Amino acid sequence: MIRMDTVTDLSLREIGVAATKVLGRAVEVRAESHIGRDLAVDSLALMNIIMELEDTFDISIPLDRLASVETAGDLSKLINDLRTRA
């Protein structure tokens, strides 16, 4: 059985990879990292990160679900929820 913290770690790592790729700079991502404030991600960059993550995890992230996402942990949880429903 796969532990949930392992899945979350994978999601957080992939969020960091996507953010680094989109932003063109190294990004350290923690569950508590606020996407806008701590990671300095604007709305356009966020959409590009979301597209990278959709490709990585082969999921579609509904825009209405993003409204409640503030931290990398929130985004990781959303990704994991969508992956388990796929």
UniProtKB/Swiss-Prot annotation:
Domain (Carrier) ranges: 6-83
Modified residues (O-(pantetheine 4'-phosphoryl)serine): 43
Protein's job: Involved in de novo bacterial ceramide synthesis.
Record has Lipid metabolism as a keyword: yes
Protein's name in the database: Probable acyl carrier protein CCNA_01221
Keyword Lipid metabolism (UniProt): yes
PROSITE patterns per record: CARRIER
Family matches, as Pfam families: PP-binding (PF00550)
Pathway note: Lipid metabolism; sphingolipid metabolism
Organism for this UniProt entry: Caulobacter vibrioides (strain NA1000 / CB15N) (Caulobacter crescentus)
Example of a GO cellular component annotation carried by this entry: membrane
Similarity field: Belongs to the acyl carrier protein (ACP) family.
Keywords: Lipid metabolism, Phosphopantetheine, Phosphoprotein
Phenotype of the disrupted gene, per the record: Deletion mutant cannot form bacterial ceramide. Mutants are impaired in growth at elevated temperatures but are resistant towards the antibiotic polymyxin B.
Biological processes per GO annotation: sphingolipid metabolic process
Family annotation (InterPro entries): ACP-like_sf (IPR036736), PP-bd_ACP (IPR009081)
